[in-house]
Amino acid sequence: MNFEKLMRNVEKRNMSAYFAKDKEEAVKTALEIMESCRAHKEKSNVTVAWGGSVTLDEVGIKEALAKEGYSAFNPYSYPPSEQARAKKMALLADVFLTSTNAITEDGELVNIDGNGNRVAAMIYGPDKVIYIIGRNKVTDTVENAYKRIKEITCPKNAVRLGRKTPCTNGACTPCLIPGQTMCSHTVITRFSSVKGRVHIIFVDEELGY
């Protein structure tokens, strides 16, 4: 994979790009970005939130945040009755951590959400957004990014989340099931209107779905 070309294509879209050879280097890079973002704030006053992400769990970034003393805000730690409010609060975080469902070789991020809170924070709200992306999520076109999400990402996430949708059997169909449907919102990010807001760390490992 030509990471140098991929990073150039991301940079031309007004987003910052970084390369990490493994999970450990990805976490180190993310912490360095956060350090540069916090200005004169104490770490304990820098709020960090995240969207649901297997990649973030795999790299260990949440544990690193706790060790470094950042004010981590986990909306998923709240009782189900309070999670909707908590997810709204995450939009006010200083830093939002996430991965992506797919990214094209030309640097376009492609994401599909069930509730929309994750893609909402990607687009607007938090001052900084840091993506950690494994090499398995790179596709050649938007069309193949969408295909990857429908055939790999959504089915695996549906099983992980215990959803009662057709894609749990590996056959993704355009279902319309309240509270269950995985593919309610589709977002393609082709440009960041605010320079310095979006930071993308590419990791030379397979991570997440």
Where are these regions (language model features)?
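Conserved phosphate- and dinucleotide-binding cores of soluble alpha/beta proteins
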Residues: 89-209
